[in-house]
Amino acid sequence: MLSNNIDEEFYYNISKYKTFNEEKFLEYYLESKSLTKPINYIYLLNKINYPHFLSFNENPYLAITNPIILVNPKFYLGDDYIPKNLILVNQFDHIKRDNEMQISNEIVDAYQRLVDFIYLNNQQLIIYSAYRSYNYQKTLYKSDNPYTAKPGHSEHQTGLAIDISNFYYGLSSNLSSSELFKLLSTNAHHFGFILRYPESKEKLTGYPFEPWHYRYVGEDISKIIYQEDLCLEEYFYKYVLLTY
């Protein structure tokens, strides 16, 4: 089957991955010729095994949860999914709101550091929306509102997503032209957060640009996403070996 040493080396490298499919070897090999070197074998496998990953014309699948959660119009959380270690937002300095909003304890320290950074730059930061249960999202959902996700398809159900702004702009599109947005969009990755629905990535995320919506993914991942100008879907396609 293999004609030369280059083929043998390619076969050896790609066959080590658990999603390698012997029957698709020729497809892998031919596609590899269009990729820059060194070959990203994870991306190559994903591209051939899951050619429609970055589109939303398939039936939905349960959310991918490893290494982090991916929720979008294609991947959903069940109605019984409740993140562990939810805590009240109003317990923490700089984050106080007079309501019962909750966030995952996983993001509290990182968010506190982000808020401190914003305050040092003479800006304020307020959480407008955090964790939402499946049932609460059900009450919010309106099929004709592109900013409202279907129940199970909202990142807010993870407890890792927050809508943040200041009192002046709130959750308005005008936030994108503000000094606060400039600070957030160019520095949030230092604290493990990403702008989840960036401008010009709407077809990949499945949602319109939201300058207020940030998602915690951890500093290692957030820095890659920022440096390579990726959205979370592109990160998964490029760096996470898909199995769904």
Q: What are these regions, as identified by a protein language model?
A:
Residues 1-130, 134-244:
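Extracytoplasmic cell-surface/polysaccharide-interacting catalytic and binding patches
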